[in-house]
Amino acid sequence: MLLLCNYYITYRCNAYCEFCHFGDHTNFKDTPFAKLDEFKSNVGQLAKLGVKFIDLTGGEPLLHKDIHLMAEFAHNLKMQTSITTNTLLYPKFAEKLAGKINLLHFSLDSPDEEEHNRIRKVDCFKSIFKSIEIAKSLGEFPDILFTVTNETYKKLPRMNELAAKHDLVLLVNPVFSYFSNPGLSQEAVDYVDEYCDGKMDVYLNKAFMKLRRDGGNDIHNPSCKAVSRVIVISPKNEIILPCYHFANDKIKIDRPISEIRKSEKLRYFIKNEGKFDFCQGCTVNCYFEPSFAFPTNLYAISSLTSKFKYSYNKLVKQKIKKKFTPKTESR
């Protein structure tokens, strides 16, 4: 059952984050942007196939000149939309995106300006707080997304204070091991898990931490549903298999997606999802979030309290605030 589309609308980025392979611009500076007509065709088909969530991702998604049109199109199809941005371009698109993004995430890697800018290798710390001001003036409640690393995990209390100061949810994103990037140490896992426990204004999927303690995905008893519940589409109009981070094959979208989903190649990848050698020990968050969507195993059950808490913040608390908070003109 397809739930989520990770749609890479660009591989290009305007930052150089040390924990992200998109930070190496030499590999991506000449890559194409997703075409709007192809996007609309694909997303329209996905809506009919039952996809409920779409992450407009990159790279830096706001580098795409049609990002607002893409968000509007998906939103009008009743999809839940999400964007994660470093905010450098958010002021340019803020008004056009307002009301069209269900989950708007502003990336902040440290409460200290110097450290954040060093990690990103670009001066963008002040842009985040300017963007928070603009977003809230438009009735938006972005989350502050903190990608926790072995170097920054002890900054978590200060990040919580900073998010609370702006009346926003802190979304804790534990770094995962991929493209030679190390994952969290056991000490960091324990610290983060203990700190976040019971805090209503902090979201951490507890299943992510259990998965790390258990050594990641086990290919002999896989937890991953990266093919059956997620579809990954590239800017080149290809379906990436089994996932972006361990791309092993690609299928050009040159026929209806429903036909592709029934193809022998897709059935092969669904049958073997989480079972490939490279799947051993995997902890890539963006595939395990939908993998734990239904309470069918201990990981999914572990994630329930976290998801209920986040849903309360986004669907109840913030909606009430939006209703009673007048919009003001952004500067």
Description of each model-found segment:
Residues 29, 77-80, 100-103, 107-255, ...:
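Radical SAM enzyme [4Fe-4S]-AdoMet core and its adjacent flexible, acidic
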Residues 1-96, 100-103, 295, 304, ...:
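Conserved alpha-helical substructure of the radical SAM core
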Residues 12, 16, 223, 278-281:
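The −1 position to Zn-ligating cysteines in a subset of zinc-ribbon hairpins
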Residues 1-2, 216, 225, 271:
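Residue-level marker of regulatory loop/turn positions in helix-turn-helix DNA-binding domains and
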Residues 1, 23, 238-331:
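Flexible mid-to-C-terminal extensions adjoining Fe-S/redox cofactors in radical SAM and related proteins
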Residues 33, 64, 149-150, 276:
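Short, solvent-exposed loop/helix junctions and linker helices
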Residues 25, 59, 109, 175, ...:
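Flexible loop residues that form catalytic
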